[in-house]
């Protein structure tokens, strides 16, 4: 494989490196309130574009079938909103014996209580070629569920409570997720033949939107003065976050590929991403509401600010590996299902 062909194949990973470097060099461009206005362009336009894109590319029957996949939905929601926070709470009982800042540890607990994001898990599932319809449903449903469940989890594990503006968050999610998806499905009905004939690069479009999300996320991270921690604490927290992500991705992978799970390789891809990703878009505003008045709010927020770009970075790097596994697994399953020719 020539160098140019290799670069073309790995354009997305190269793009990730470039946008992170660009964010580090001049974070003010993509930070909140900056020239790119990510609080509008990302929160509303980019997320809406992702789900409009999904509505255009997905067959209606695929979405309908995904709604009926109750076992998959239960697995994802129970893992991300029950098992995840409980496992982290147990893990933190051990970490509390170390010299790591206690507020950073509380921040790790808040990460575990967050709902799944409405965009990154869908884009990564699409990039691999997994069950995108299931990823869309679980990301959207998990986000709606998290609006109610996350404050209760924070109260349970950290003893924090506050009134959460459910109506405004629900309406924002509805307008940026449900409405664009429905519009995409309606438009698809009228241009279905053209879409099947031309086959637009929906995956590449979603990946470009994800690069924009990565860029603005890192701009916000690099421009945040509250992340000025001592090197030891920062390195340890980053290491722990990557360890948690890899461990839980492996765990969901093993569960969903076990002999009696009943999940397809495409289902496994959606499960791995949807079960382990956490929302920064909903998370940070929710932390500001729930922990209003806390002098350590900035420290509590740090793990989530690190977790979000880390999950996108790790997921993006693993896309080729997971895609290769999924294709080989599909091929193996197809061969085992073929009827044997009698001798």
Swiss-Prot record:
Is the keyword Amino-acid biosynthesis assigned to this protein? no
* Annotated localization: Cell membrane; Endoplasmic reticulum membrane; Golgi apparatus membrane
Pull one GO CC term from this UniProt entry. Answer: endoplasmic reticulum membrane
Q: Which Pfam families match?
A: SBF_like (PF13593)
GO MF, any single term: symporter activity
Q: Which domain of life is it from?
A: Eukaryota
Q: Which residues lie on this side of the membrane: Cytoplasmic?
A: 1-9, 59-71, 138, 185-201, 256-270, 320-343
Which processes are annotated in GO (biological process)? sodium ion transport
* Keyword entries, A-Z: Cell membrane, Endoplasmic reticulum, Golgi apparatus, Ion transport, Membrane, Sodium, Sodium transport, Symport, Transmembrane, Transmembrane helix, Transport
Its annotated function is as follows: Involved in teeth and skeletal development. Has an essential role in the biosynthesis and trafficking of glycosaminoglycans and glycoproteins to produce a proper functioning extracellular matrix. Required for extracellular matrix mineralization. Also involved in the regulation of cellular calcium homeostasis. Does not show transport activity towards bile acids or steroid sulfates.
**Can you tell me which family this protein belongs to?**
Belongs to the bile acid:sodium symporter (BASS) (TC 2.A.28) family.
**Which protein, by its recorded name, is this?**
Sodium/bile acid cotransporter 7-B
Q: Could you read off the lineage of the organism from its UniProt record?
A: Eukaryota, Metazoa, Chordata, Craniata, Vertebrata
């Amino acid at each position: 494989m020539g160098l140019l062909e290799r670069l073309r194949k790995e354009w997305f990973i190269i793009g990730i490196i470039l946008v992170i470097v660009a964010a580090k060099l001049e974070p003010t461009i993509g930070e909140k309130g900056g020239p790119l206005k990510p609080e509008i362009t990302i929160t509303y336009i980019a997320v809406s574009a992702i789900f409009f894109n999904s509505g255009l590319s997905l067959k209606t029957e695929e979405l309908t079938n995904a709604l009926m996949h109750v076992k998959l939905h239960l697995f994802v929601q129970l893992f991300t909103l029950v098992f995840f926070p409980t496992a982290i709470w147990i893990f933190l009982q051990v970490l509390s014996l170390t010299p790591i800042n206690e507020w950073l540890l509380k921040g790790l607990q808040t990460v575990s209580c967050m709902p799944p994001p409405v965009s990154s898990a869908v884009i990564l599932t699409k990039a691999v070629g997994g069950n995108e319809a299931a990823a869309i449903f679980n990301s959207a449903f998990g986000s709606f569920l998290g609006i109610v469940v996350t404050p209760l989890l924070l109260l349970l594990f950290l003893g924090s409570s506050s009134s959460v503006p459910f109506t405004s968050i629900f309406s924002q999610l509805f307008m940026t997720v449900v409405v664009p998806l429905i519009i995409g499905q309606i438009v698809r009905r009228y241009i279905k033949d053209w879409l099947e004939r031309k086959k637009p690069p929906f995956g590449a479009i979603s990946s470009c939107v994800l690069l924009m999300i990565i860029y603005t996320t890192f701009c916000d991270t690099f421009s945040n003065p509250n992340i000025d921690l001592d090197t030891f604490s920062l390195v340890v927290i980053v290491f722990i976050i990557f360890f948690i992500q890899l461990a839980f991705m492996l765990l969901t992978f093993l569960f969903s590929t076990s002999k009696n799970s009943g999940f397809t390789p495409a289902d496994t891809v959606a499960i791995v991403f949807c079960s382990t990703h956490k929302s920064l878009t909903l998370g940070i505003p929710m932390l500001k509401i729930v922990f209003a008045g806390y002098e350590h709010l900035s420290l509590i927020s740090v793990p989530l600010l690190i977790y979000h770009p880390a999950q996108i970075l790790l997921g993006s790097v693993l896309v080729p590996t997971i895609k290769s596994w999924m294709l080989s697994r599909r091929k193996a399953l197809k061969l085992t299902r073929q009827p044997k020719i009698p001798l």
